[in-house]
A protein has these predicted regions:
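A generic structural motif
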Residues: 81-89, 117, 143, 163
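Substrate-recognition "cap/lid" segment bordering the active-site pocket of phosphatases
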Residues: 94-145
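Substrate-recognition element of Asp-dependent hydrolases with the DxDx(T/V) motif
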Residues: 65-70, 74-109
Length: 204
């Protein structure tokens, strides 16, 4: 039986923050003090929620979105889970409905992760994932799949429909109580999924 890992992309597989930070700096925007503990982009840059959301959408639909680096140790362990343990990945990302943005995302993942991703599902920029997760959970092929996220609300939505949840830790979510495991990096995720618990991720 084929094994699946369903995962968010930005802040889990790819380092969206790094790419966005460089892009914002290029456009003359500076972060506020303590930005790393803020999830909302407006709060990070001292602007309104609407202004922040508009810039996120603009960035997500720019050419820059096709050149994001891997997050932490994602490249090594995603490929290892796919090539050694035969897991297939499904991306569920609130990137954009723009078809060119999706094509750039697929190309970015292919370049870094090879053939690990079987499918890339793009939702509207910043959209919640409840309905998409319910739809995936209704398909027998994804039964018992892992679900990896960095946004607690989305993690809980996946756990609620039956997926096994892992949250990637960041400054903005480190004090949040979650119904699932918390990983600091992909080595933690790899060890948990393969039950090689040398550095067991903690549950909170």
């Amino acid at each position: 039986m084929q094994k699946y890992i369903i995962t968010d992309i930005d802040g889990v597989v790819l380092d969206w923050e790094e790419g966005f930070s460089v892009w914002m700096e290029h456009h003359g925007h500076e972060k506020v003090e303590g930005y790393q503990f803020q999830y909302n982009i407006g709060d990070r840059y001292g602007m309104t929620y609407e202004q922040g959301s508009k810039l996120v959408k603009q960035f997500n639909e720019s050419a820059a979105i096709g050149f994001l680096p891997p997050l932490r140790d994602a490249q090594y362990y995603v490929k290892l889970l796919h090539e050694k343990h035969r897991y297939k990945f499904v991306a569920l990302t609130s990137l954009s409905l723009d078809p060119y943005a999706k094509a750039l995302r697929e190309r970015n993942l292919k370049k870094l992760m090879g053939d690990a991703f079987e499918r890339v599902i793009c939702l509207d920029t910043g959209a919640d994932k409840n309905d998409a997760l319910k739809e995936l959970a209704s398909k027998k092929k994804y039964e018992n799949a892992w679900w990896i996220e960095d946004k607690p609300e989305n993690l809980h939505a996946g756990v609620k429909v039956g997926f096994k949840g892992i949250m990637m830790e960041h400054g903005h979510n480190m004090n949040t109580s979650v119904n699932g495991f918390v990983a600091k990096n992909w080595e933690d995720i790899y060890n948990l999924i393969t039950q090689d618990l040398k550095t067991e991720p903690y549950k909170r």
